[in-house]
């Protein structure tokens, strides 16, 4: 079972994915759950946020193993960690795509970088290929950012379009898609 969990900021999407992992761990003693965390600590605020998430996750879901990844690691780690006894949570695709779109070295440049769309597309294709090859359940978290106003900048508009396209492609291979609204799950595709 592959599930895509979408929602806005603070909509409850990560909590929903963590609850899926907790239920998985409780269902069978041999089960394991792994969270592939895509956030990277690029500044003090993000470091504090990541540390807070680590602490809160450890309290909410004892036994959930967290692996912090770089932008290149998601497809390969997804395949490496996936098995019939292991549920893998990817949190989140939005940050993963952000890091592909604006690599670390480009974020510190004075000029606005232009991402290599070919490189980004190749990595997205690798993720989709990995999702089709997984050997166990996967829950992917992503932001739904296309419901707001149209952004002013050309690069931001292109990113919103790219994330929307990524979400559509991931949803197409998932058996379940859940939209989180104010902490409430709305099943968009699949069974409740």
Where are these regions (language model features)?
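Flexible, compositionally biased loop and terminal segments
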Residues: 2-6, 94, 190
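A basic- and aromatic-enriched beta-loop-alpha substructure that forms the phosphate/nucleotide-
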Residues: 71, 80-101
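Loop/turn-to-beta-strand initiation segments
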Residues: 63, 84-87, 134-139
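Residue-level signal for inorganic ion chemistry
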Residues: 17, 53, 89, 143, ...
């Amino acid at each position: 079972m592959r599930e895509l969990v979408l929602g806005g900021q603070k909509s409850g999407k990560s909590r929903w994915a963590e609850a899926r992992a907790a239920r998985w761990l409780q269902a069978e003693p041999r089960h394991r759950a792994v969270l592939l965390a895509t956030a990277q600590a690029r500044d003090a605020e993000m470091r504090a946020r990541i540390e807070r998430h680590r602490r809160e996750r450890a309290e909410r879901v004892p036994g959930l193993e967290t692996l912090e990844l770089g932008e290149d690691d998601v497809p390969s780690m997804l395949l490496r960690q996936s098995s019939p006894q292991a549920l893998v949570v990817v949190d989140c695709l939005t940050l993963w795509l952000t890091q592909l779109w604006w690599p670390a070295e480009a974020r510190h440049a004075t000029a606005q970088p232009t991402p290599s769309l070919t490189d980004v597309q190749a990595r997205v294709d690798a993720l989709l290929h990995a999702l089709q090859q997984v050997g166990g359940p996967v829950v992917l978290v992503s932001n739904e950012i296309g419901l707001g106003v149209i952004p002013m900048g050309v690069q931001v508009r292109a990113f919103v379009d790219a994330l929307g396209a990524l979400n559509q492609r991931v949803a197409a291979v998932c058996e379940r898609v859940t939209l989180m609204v104010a902490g409430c799950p709305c099943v968009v595709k699949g069974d409740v």
